Structures are given as structure tokens and as C-alpha cells.
A protein has these predicted regions:
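Conserved active-site-proximal phosphate/metal-binding subdomains
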Residues: 152-175, 181-327
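Active-site entrance/lid segments in N-terminal catalytic domains of soluble metabolic enzymes
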Residues: 1-169
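Acidic, glycine-rich active-site loops and adjacent beta-strand->loop/helix elements
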Residues: 74, 147, 179-180, 202
């Protein structure tokens, strides 16, 4: 059940992708997601040198024989990123899947990857951008609703509206992202026309996720109202968990502060301190509204399997109700 073009293209057991998360998607975490039947996704931008990235790719390969992917960020960055260095490793190490996010993926990059047999994905926040990626030649797209954690764009379109629009407009498979945290959301995304889902925030509350226990406990206690969009004044809107750092960023933006003042709070160094040391107010954490549906820490495999099993149970209940209604 739930075999779609996404599972065919990615070679996964389930049509589920574990979204890459900066500072969090370690090789061990990525491999755990892939071993659970989903697609683990590395964040190439976590690695400052080609050697470090190659070592991380090899570490993933040593921990799983299942497919995994690498995200290439095409967003503007304060630290210059030479994606060519990552691409060389991807091709040399036979990485099976590459996801791009941010600007439209260059056609020459896609051609090189596809010539090597790499499955290509693009993550975007609008139908227009998804169509552009399809024209560029990607194999599938993840379309990201505004409920999601991370870069949600400026349009404010919800997953409920965005996914059927994308599914109607595109010929390639669509994955839904944004606020999906259980089997109900997974099944709803398929009903809307998606052929799979990308989840991120839900995976923060897993045993394998390498964030501090203090932060996991804080997320357990969080509600669906405990997120907010920030960085809109930098045209890089991000939905974040509502902590002191995120509220400070929002305050600075309201005051008309310059980019450097804002980034001094939203800096990745602060986020790393939060993730590693457990100071839950030290930095900004991307977080979806789906955090309100999360109440306990489980193994990754249990989260993935539970999502699929819950969706199956819902279908069985529907089938039983329909059968009773026709007798």
C-alpha cells in the first residue's frame, strides 16, 4: 500500500522524505531515516570543506544500504557556497538522490546529475516555481506550505490549498510538505493529489535526532501556536519555534533594524549552541505548526511506520463505513 511514483523513483519503502535540517541532519540521523523505509536527506551546507562532506557521505553509506539524498542549497548565503565541490563528491560517491532548494536549479547541473543516474528533486513554495523546476528537468518536486518549519516564502499559501493546485498543474510527482506530523496528515496529502510527503519537525522528537534533551522536552510542551514567521524583512521568511531568540528577531524587524543586527541573533552559531548545549533560548529553530501534534519521543522507525499504519487504519475505517452504507 502507498506505492507511488515517488517510491518508484526514490527506491524507498514508503513515499516519505525526511527533510534536511541544517546542523541536525548528521550522517547517523540520515541513515536512521533511510533504514526506516523513508529517504534520509543530508544538508551539504553543513560541511565547509569537500573532504568533510565526502567523509559524511561515506559515513551514511557505511550505516545504510538504502537510498539517501543530498540537499544543495541555492539560497543566497553569508558564507559563500561552491556547490561544484559538493557535486563532485555526489558523482564520485554515487549518491542516488539530489534535492535542490532556493533558486531554480540550473539546467546544466540537472543534466550532469541525470546523466549519472541521479534522481533530482526541487523544493519550492509555489506552483509557479514548481512549474519552473519541471521545465528545468527535475524528476519530482516538494511543494512547501506555509505551516511548515523553515523557509516558507512570502506567499503564505497553506498546504491544503497549495498541494491540489500543484498536483493539477504538474506532470511530475509532487511531495507535500508543511505541518504534516502524523498519519492523518500523510493520508490527507495523498488525498489532495500528492504522491508522497516530506516531514521535518516531526523527526525532531525521535531518539536518533541529535538535539539536546532540553530542546526535545520544550518541543513536547509546545503547542500549534508556538511558532512564528520571522526574517520577512530580509525576504527570507522562516517559520520558527517561538522562543526568546525568535521573538527578539521579530522585535528587531519591527524596529527596522538592519540585517546585521538581525543576523547577530539568528546566526547559525547561536542555533548550534541551542542544539548542542541545551540553552533553548540561545538561537532560532525552524519549526512547523505540526509541533502541536507531537507529544513524545520515539525511534525514527516507529514514527515512520506509525504514520503509515495510522493512514491504513483510517482507510480501513472509511471502507467499513462505505460498505455498511451500501448494504
Amino acid at each position: 500500500m502507498f506505492q507511488t511514483r515517488v517510491t518508484q523513483l526514490l527506491g524507498t519503502e514508503y513515499p516519505i522524505v525526511g527533510g534536511c535540517m541544517m546542523h541536525i541532519s548528521t550522517p547517523e540521523f540520515v541513515a536512521a531515516i533511510s533504514n526506516a523505509g523513508a529517504l534520509g536527506m543530508m544538508a551539504s551546507a553543513m560541511y565547509e570543506t569537500q573532504e568533510d562532506f565526502r567523509e559524511a557521505v561515506r559515513r551514511v553509506k557505511s550505516l545504510t544500504d538504502k537510498p539517501f539524498g543530498v540537499n544543495l542549497s541555492l539560497f543566497p548565503a553569508l558564507r559563500p557556497i561552491d556547490n561544484e565541490l559538493y557535486v563532485e563528491v555526489i558523482l564520485e560517491e554515487n549518491v542516488p538522490v539530489v534535492e535542490t532548494s532556493g533558486h531554480r536549479p540550473p539546467e546544466d547541473l540537472l543534466a550532469r546529475l541525470k546523466a549519472a543516474g541521479v534522481v533530482t528533486m526541487h523544493k519550492c513554495v509555489s506552483v509557479r516555481h514548481a512549474l519552473s523546476a519541471q521545465r528545468a528537468g527535475v524528476d519530482l518536486v516538494t511543494v512547501f506550505g506555509s505551516e511548515g518549519g523553515g523557509h516558507i516564502g512570502e506567499l503564505g499559501l497553506s498546504t491544503l490549498v497549495l498541494i491540489p493546485l500543484a498536483a493539477d498543474a504538474l506532470e511530475i510527482p509532487v511531495l507535500a510538505a508543511g505541518g504534516i506530523a502524523d498519519g492523518r496528515g500523510f493520508l490527507a496529502a495523498l488525498a489532495l493529489g500528492a504522491e508522497g510527503v516530506t516531514i521535518g519537525t516531526r523527526l525532531l522528537l525521535t531518539e536518533e535526532c541529535p538535539i539536546h534533551p532540553n530542546l526535545k522536552q520544550a518541543l513536547i510542551e509546545a503547542r500549534e501556536t508556538d511558532t512564528l514567521p520571522i526574517l520577512g524583512t530580509l525576504h527570507n521568511t522562516l517559520r520558527a519555534w517561538r522562543n526568546e531568540a525568535a521573538l527578539k528577531v521579530a522585535e528587531l524587524e519591527q524596529q527596522g533594524a538592519d540585517m546585521w543586527a538581525i543576523l547577530s541573533v539568528a546566526a547559525g552559531t547561536n542555533t548550534r549552541r541551542m542544539l548542542q548545549d541545551g540553552d533553548v533560548n540561545a538561537g532560532v529553530l525552524a519549526c512547523s505548526q505540526g509541533v502541536g501534534l507531537m507529544r513524545e519521543v520515539k525511534p525514527v522507525a516507529e514514527v515512520i511506520r506509525g504514520m503509515v499504519e495510522e493512514a491504513q487504519e483510517i482507510l480501513q475505517r472509511w471502507e467499513g463505513t462505505t460498505n455498511r452504507g451500501t448494504n
